[in-house]
Regions:
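Membrane-proximal intracellular helices of multi-pass ion channels
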Residues: 1-447
Length: 447
């Protein structure tokens, strides 16, 4: 039995390492492709630092850029970026093993275990079927999104260019990447040109939400449809938390940030800002015009991020929910963290605390370092680091002007936010002995 546990732990650890290595390899391939002269409009070789930053941002579905995507990169370069977004969003392991399965080869237990960790599935059983469902559903949703965006972009840009823009922005929105091609109007302008187009705003928001709620939630929705009582605890927590994190910030933005204009404009701007801030990185308004309280709220939302097993990064909605519920449990002087008539394991509570600690330390320390190196306001730099570690992509306009040191810090944060803090830690540390002896208990005062 002990031998079996050790073998299982070694396989478990190898899965984490394979996930990390696969992302590294994808970033390297993307960097080399973006360095090619054919990737830039000027047909010149792009520097390694610029190409790598773009590849990391695309693979980690972030959206922070040092070169405007529309005006600097050629059609080939944009296609490379889109490929990185698609594979990075779905997960390298998910795409790779799906191709292996399509070729007729069998997928063994080790591959299934790796796939399980890649999409944060609770068990190995049914993982191949779930992965196939994820990939098929993702492609269908992206195609539907492109078809819905096509009338807007084809009308503005012509049929050929409009179709390309529709496909690019549908995939970018669904994968929560935040890359856009509207630098043709003004560099780094994102979707500000369409701030009053309610139809386009709604389509983009729906794509962002769909990609950000997590693949496991899709599985429950696909299996149980409207019978919410049969959903897993994680799906219920994710859906509830996501709804709260959309509605409450939207109300703040509506009453305190967008307090001018028509009710329709204020409503759509508030909802769009609330949805995109946690995961996607598109913006339809000038973020620099927000006051400090609004900026601080956006920093918090970016740190929380999307949901487990989704295309988004950040601490994750489930982590935030577990931390909130554990705080309520302590205040009510209860022993068990409960939700929807279920008890949450102590392991999940401890993991949530560890994730919060790692994210806060990295986010704040990185912000302080960048602030000192670049001589910029701390809040501006914290906004940038939260955007990177949350793989969001929003910026107050400082990304392209940062030094090499600051860019490296942002790349590390983007990779950390996409792969996940626990994945990196588990891959680096030796597996724990499941037979650890328990030491004597002694109380310590906290709070």
């Amino acid at each position: 039995m002990l031998h079996k546990n050790r073998v299982k732990n070694r396989t478990h650890m190898t899965s984490f390492r394979v996930i990390i290595i696969s992302f590294f390899c994808l970033i390297l391939v993307g960097t080399l492709l973006l360095m090619l002269p054919i990737s830039s409009r000027q047909r010149c070789v792009t520097s390694f630092p610029d190409a790598m930053f773009t590849a990391v941002s695309a693979t980690c579905v972030t959206g922070l850029v040092v070169k405007d995507t529309a005006t600097y990169w050629s059609l080939f370069g944009q296609a490379v970026i889109l490929m990185l977004i698609q594979i990075g969003g779905m997960g390298v392991i998910t795409v790779g093993l799906t191709i292996i399965r399509a070729s007729g080869r069998k997928i063994g237990l080790w591959q299934r275990s790796t796939m399980q960790e890649s999409i944060s599935a609770p068990q190995v059983g049914g993982i191949v079927k779930l992965t196939g469902f994820i990939l098929k559903t993702s492609l269908i949703i992206e195609m539907i999104g492109a078809a819905l965006l096509a009338p807007v972009f084809c009308n503005d840009l012509g049929i050929a260019k409009g179709l390309w823009y529709s496909l690019f922005h549908s995939i970018s929105a669904f994968c929560n990447a935040g890359f856009d091609l509207f630098g043709i109007r003004e560099p780094f302008s994102s979707l500000t040109f369409y701030h009053s187009n309610i139809y386009l705003n709604i389509i983009i928001m729906l794509l962002i939400i769909t990609g950000g709620i997590g693949f496991l939630v899709w599985g429950d929705i696909g299996t149980h449809k409207h019978r919410i009582r049969r959903y897993s605890l994680q799906s219920k927590v994710v859906l509830m938390t996501s709804a709260v994190l959309i509605v409450l910030p939207a109300l703040y933005f509506f009453f305190f940030e967008y307090d001018h204009g028509t009710i329709h404009d204020r409503t759509i701007h508030s909802l769009f800002q609330s949805v995109t801030t946690r995961t996607a990185g598109f913006n339809t308004t000038d973020l620099a015009a927000m006051d400090e309280s609004g900026t601080a709220i956006m920093v918090i939302l970016m740190l929380i991020g999307g949901s487990p097993g989704s295309t988004a990064g950040g601490m994750k909605t489930a982590t935030f929910a577990v931390l909130f519920l554990s705080a309520i449990t302590v205040l009510r002087r209860r022993n068990d963290v409960q939700c929807f008539k279920r008890r949450i394991s102590n392991e999940a509570v401890c993991s949530a605390g560890a994730v919060l600690f790692m994210y806060l330390v990295l986010f704040f320390t990185s912000g302080v370092i960048i602030s000192r190196v670049e001589n910029l306001p701390l809040l501006t730099c914290l906004f940038e680091t939260s955007s990177a570690i949350g793989t969001v992509g929003l910026t107050l306009g400082i990304t392209s002007g940062l030094s090499a040191v600051s860019r490296v810090i942002l790349m590390i944060l983007m990779f950390f936010g996409r792969v996940g803090g626990l994945t990196l830690i588990y891959a680096a540390l030796p597996s724990a002995d499941s037979q650890n002896s328990r030491l004597p208990l002694e109380k310590i005062s906290v709070g």
